[in-house]
């Protein structure tokens, strides 16, 4: 079975398909199929484990990985680093504003402490990603997911990062099988 899959993968490579068909059609189909597979696998992992393997910022991350995989924002270093910064900044903001034991903002509403935590988390995430040279826009959503209390337990943040890592592995494998020179870690020089 593996030989069949790899044989098909060699024959149906995205760059060669783009040469024969509309690039918008091929890339749209590639993004569609891989978005379904990536988020479907994460959602299945969430159902099986009862852990939050699926969260809103995985959606834009998957889109970057499968539509613009060669942009710096989609490389593994920026994806993992950006989400780690976002999760850490969100949690630090919860701690500083005394909100670690509060219900999520969607349940208890938004009070001034939550305003401060959300604003601080996004500011910290934005600045730290620039300073660390790991820009990944979906991490802005990750930090708000945490600072708004949707995921607020340290173990949930660990699961969040495992989910991001699994998505990066999927992105690497799927893009490479499709013939796309997706980077192993850092962005390619001169790309983006």
Question: What is each stretch, according to the model?
Answer:
Residues 61-63, 142-146, 165:
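Hydrophobic transmembrane alpha-helices of multi-pass, membrane-embedded glycosylation machinery
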Residues 101-136:
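Internal alpha-helical transmembrane segments of multi-pass membrane proteins
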Residues 54-59, 136-142:
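Transmembrane helix boundary and interhelical junction motifs in multipass membrane proteins
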Residues 42, 125, 143:
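Generic structural marker for isolated residues within well-ordered, non-membrane alpha-helices
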Residues 70-79, 128-139:
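Membrane-helix interface "capping/anchor" motifs
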């Amino acid at each position: 079975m593996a030989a069949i899959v790899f044989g098909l993968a060699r024959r149906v490579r995205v760059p060669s398909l783009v040469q024969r068909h509309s690039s918008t059609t091929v890339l749209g189909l590639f993004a569609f199929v891989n978005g379904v597979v990536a988020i479907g696998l994460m959602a299945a992992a969430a159902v099986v484990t009862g852990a939050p393997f699926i969260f809103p910022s995985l959606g834009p991350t998957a889109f970057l990985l499968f539509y613009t995989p060669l942009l710096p924002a989609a490389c593994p270093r920026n994806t993992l680093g950006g989400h780690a910064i976002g999760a850490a900044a969100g949690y630090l903001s919860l701690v500083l504003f005394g909100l670690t034991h509060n219900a999520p903002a969607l349940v208890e509403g938004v009070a001034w402490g939550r305003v401060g935590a959300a604003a601080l988390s996004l500011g910290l995430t934005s600045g730290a990603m620039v300073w660390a040279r790991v820009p990944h826009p979906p991490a802005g959503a990750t930090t708000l997911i945490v600072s708004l209390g949707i995921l607020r337990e340290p173990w949930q943040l660990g699961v969040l990062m495992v989910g991001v890592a699994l998505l990066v592995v999927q992105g690497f494998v799927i893009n490479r099988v499709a013939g796309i020179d997706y980077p192993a870690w850092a962005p390619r020089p001169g790309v983006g």
